Amino acid sequence: MLEMYVNCDGKKLRCGYTTGSCAAGAAKAATYMLYNEEILDLIKIDTPKGIELMLPIENIKKGDGFVECSIIKDGGDDPDITNGIEIWARAEVKKEGYTLKGGIGVGIVKSEGLYVEKGDYAINPVPRLMIEKEVKKVLPKDNGVLITVFVPKGEEIAKKTFNPRLNIVGGISILGTTGIVVPMSEEALQQSIKLEMNQKIKSGIKNFTFLFGNMGEDKAKEMGIDPKGFVIMSNYVGFALNCCRENNIKKILMVGHIGKMCKIAAGCFNTHSRVCGVRLEILALELALMGADTNFIEKIYREKTTEGAVKIIGKEYKDIYRRIGVKIMKKIKDFTYGEVNADIVLYSMEKGILWDSREVI
């Protein structure tokens, strides 16, 4: 177990190691045991982060001209679906040279725009380098080895990852840029946004719909919006908009719950609650600007949720949603220095669509 910790919102969280580190360790151990009689319990690898890992070997299978071994993915306190999955590597005797391929449970890339070529196994560049480097440390001179990375439960697990969205089929990806999993890593989430956008751009998609999560995705599908252009941006609105600028995307659609979208109206481009908590404040401010009674404004402000506030606002002040929507559109344009224009859809869970800028004549 990796005894490395980070502080997240005052909580001490344990770091872990990536699927890439597991694959590198399993491949190194299998190669060593292929050419040596010794049976290993642990294998040491270096990571790009500069941290040395001592990884426990879970299972070993030896046969004529091959060795297979596995390492359990330990993501620490990161809530990743691959945590606890068994990553296997098979080392086979080869006359000369080094070859790496994927096997069962490792996805195959079916689209361009990702870090791996279309048609190849989804073993990302850094893990590829890690595996090769570690294997060659123990590969005897003038001998060769064929390494196959496989994940028996990979196809099942992959259904709950980003891979179906990225058109990676048949299994999980072998990932990791540092070899270390940092719990709640913003970098990992942002990388998912960038990857998804790149893949869609390469496949010729021009109409992008940005969503905060699964609820927004369901609402957008319900509205009949083409899901091929969906991008889940989570709380990273600013990052997603910067990706648009980098890729010369001039026009987007953003669909979001009124609670999240209010934050953008206030100029917050990271909508996580610990970064930006203004929601009811924006509703109260707009009502004040519309001339609402002070007691009514206070009632809205005292509500626990924006859903509750929307129920109270009713039809009398329904123009509030247009006003907020227009502000969001302006904030997005200002944030991107005029390079990105956005259409906006605001919704609540109970009332449905509150305002859709595309319906404004």
Swiss-Prot record:
- What SUPFAM superfamilies does the annotation carry? CbiD-like
Matching NCBIfam families: cbiD
UniProt-listed Pfam families: CbiD
Task: Provide the family line.
Answer: Belongs to the CbiD family.
Is Methyltransferase found in the keyword set? yes
Q: What is its EC number?
A: 2.1.1.195
Mind telling me which residue stretches traverse the membrane in this protein? none
Name of the protein described by the UniProt record: Cobalt-precorrin-5B C(1)-methyltransferase
What organism is recorded for this protein?
A: Clostridium acetobutylicum (strain ATCC 824 / DSM 792 / JCM 1419 / IAM 19013 / LMG 5710 / NBRC 13948 / NRRL B-527 / VKM B-1787 / 2291 / W)
Gene Ontology molecular-function annotations = cobalt-precorrin-5B C1-methyltransferase activity
Quote the catalytic activity from the record.
Co-precorrin-5B + S-adenosyl-L-methionine = Co-precorrin-6A + S-adenosyl-L-homocysteine
Got any disulfides in this one, which pairs?
none
Q: Which pathway, per its entry?
A: Cofactor biosynthesis; adenosylcobalamin biosynthesis; cob(II)yrinate a,c-diamide from sirohydrochlorin (anaerobic route): step 6/10
* Alphabetic keyword roster: Cobalamin biosynthesis, Methyltransferase, S-adenosyl-L-methionine, Transferase
Record-linked InterPro entries:
CbiD, CbiD_sf
Q: Among the record's GO biological process terms, what is one?
A: methylation
